[in-house]
Amino acid sequence: MTEQRHNHIPQEAFDWYDEYAHGLMDRRTFLKKLGGLVALGYSMAMLSSALLPNYALAEQVSFNDPDIKASYKTFDSFKGHGEGKGYLVEPANLTGKHPIVLVIHENRGLNPYIKDVARRLAKAGFIAFAPDALHPLGGYPGNDDEGRAMQRSMDKQKIQQDFIAAAEYIKRHPNSNGKLGAVGFCFGGYMVNYLAAVDNKLINAGVPYYGTPAVKELRQNIKAPLLVHLAEFDKRVNATWPEYESDLKAHQVPYTMHMYEQANHGFHNDSTSRYDEKQAELSWQRTLAFFNEQLI
C-alpha cells in the first residue's frame, strides 16, 4: 500500500475538510475556502484528489481471498430501527472458538474501507462483524457525501440501539469464544466509547480511533480495557481527551492512549490523503496485539 498523504496541501485544507465532513461547516463555505487556495495557485482537481476518498486504494484484503469468507446478516433491533444488517467476515474453514470484533464505521455508513478493515481482522483470525447504520434507509449509497447526509438525518438514539443489538447478536455466534471486542473510526470511535459505557458487560475490549467519549454520566460504568488512538492535528477530538482521561483514571479503567505525531483525523483510512502509512500500520499492529491479549 502506497502512502497517500499530500504533504504539499496546506494543513488548513485538511482542517476545513474535517469541519465539513462532521457538519461543522456547510458545503458552500467549504468550497469558498478551497477557492481561496485556488487563487493562490492550487488546482481544484488537485485539492479534490487530496481530500476526497478513492476506495480503490483501500483494498488490502480482497473479498475473494481464500483465507476468509464473507456474507451479509440481518438481525433484530427492537429498540432501534427494527432490523439491522451487517457484513460478517470469518476465517475460512471456521472451526473451534474464536474471538469476535465488532467493526464500526465513520459517519457515512458501511463504505468499502470499513469492509476491508473487517476482512483484515478475519485474515488475522478474528470473526468480524461490521453493521451498516444506514440499512434502514437502504444502506451505504456509494458515495460519502450522500452517506453523511443520510446518517445525519437519522435518529442518533436509534442508531446507538442498533449497534447495541448488533453486539448482542454477534455475541451469539456459534463459534464465539465468549469475548467481544470493538474497533471504530471517527463516529465509530465514539460508538466504541459508548458501548463500553452504556453496558459494562457488552464488550470486553475497545479500540476507538479518533472518537469522542460517551457522555460524562455514563463513563463511570466503563470496565473494558481501552486502546485509544488519537491524531496530533485532530484538534476537535483531542479537545475532549483531557476530561475523558481524567474520568478513566477516576474510575480505574485500564487504558492506553497513543498520540500519532503529524497525523490527521482519519489517518488510518487508506482511501484518502489523510492516510499516514507509517502511523496507520503502527496503530494497527497495536490494535491486533491488544485484541490478542484481551480476547484470546
Give each language-model segment a name:
Residues 165-223:
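Primarily recognizes the serine-hydrolase "nucleophile elbow" in alpha/beta-hydrolase
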Residues 18, 29-53:
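N-terminal export signals
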Residues 228-230:
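Short beta-strand/loop motif that positions the catalytic acidic residue
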Residues 97-106:
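Short beta-strand element of the alpha/beta-hydrolase
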Residues 149-172:
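Alpha/beta-hydrolase active-site loop
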Residues 1-29:
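N-terminal secretory signal peptides
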